[in-house]
């Protein structure tokens, strides 16, 4: 259960954002007396989820056709891409007015326009989720699927409850806390992707002082504290822990984490004193 926490946090955050956007859209339509258009919001949502499954399947099939060094390069690029999109998403969401954005877009009277709005809202989050989860799915497919499913279920439940109780939960606090968690996860992905690239370069005979080990805890893979073990695996997913690291990985990982935590804190300010989303 604990080893899937990273995947669960990702889908909880992304799924919650998507579910909240759709829930606000549906509530706005009902409040505006446009109940006959609610089904179009659901049509758009279903189409977006289907598109997400198609993209995920294509990624898995593409990875399955790779071998050796190609897989390492794919994992490295997938990790870097996930970090890039994740970074953009965290900072972009910091300044969003969820309710206001949805209601402005929903003012259009075209029914299929409502479906398109819902599709755009959801497919963006679905694609981001697929990108974020790809490195995890490559390493542990079953754990990733279970963790992602659990996160999505919790996200949908939270979105419905929050809408029903009229935003009594502080959404800014929620997004602030999950942004901090995601910053640690993204830093770990950056480190993992860097490690894969280092391995490829070393196999090609390329050497550099930064590729040398910055530290090694001397932990055997059979030890639960190893990053492939039970306890170490949890820490690896959630916080980017590894039993050993190259200098370049350590520098990039810690540098990214420090920069992101600073930007997140600056973007949200003193969360307890800020207005809710």
From Swiss-Prot:
| Record-annotated membrane-spanning stretches | 46-66, 73-93, 143-163, 174-194, 228-248
State any GO CC term: high-affinity iron permease complex
- Report the GO molecular function annotations: ferrous iron transmembrane transporter activity
Its subcellular locations are: Cell membrane
In the bilayer, the protein is annotated as:
Multi-pass membrane protein
Record's keyword annotation contains Transmembrane helix: yes
The domain of life for this entry's organism is: Archaea
Q: Which UniProt keywords apply?
A: Cell membrane, Membrane, Transmembrane, Transmembrane helix
Q: Name one Pfam family in it.
A: FTR1
**Family stated for the protein in its record:** Belongs to the oxidase-dependent Fe transporter (OFeT) (TC 9.A.10.1) family.
Q: What's the protein called, per UniProt?
A: Uncharacterized protein AF_0154
Q: What is the species listed in this Swiss-Prot or TrEMBL entry?
A: Archaeoglobus fulgidus (strain ATCC 49558 / DSM 4304 / JCM 9628 / NBRC 100126 / VC-16)
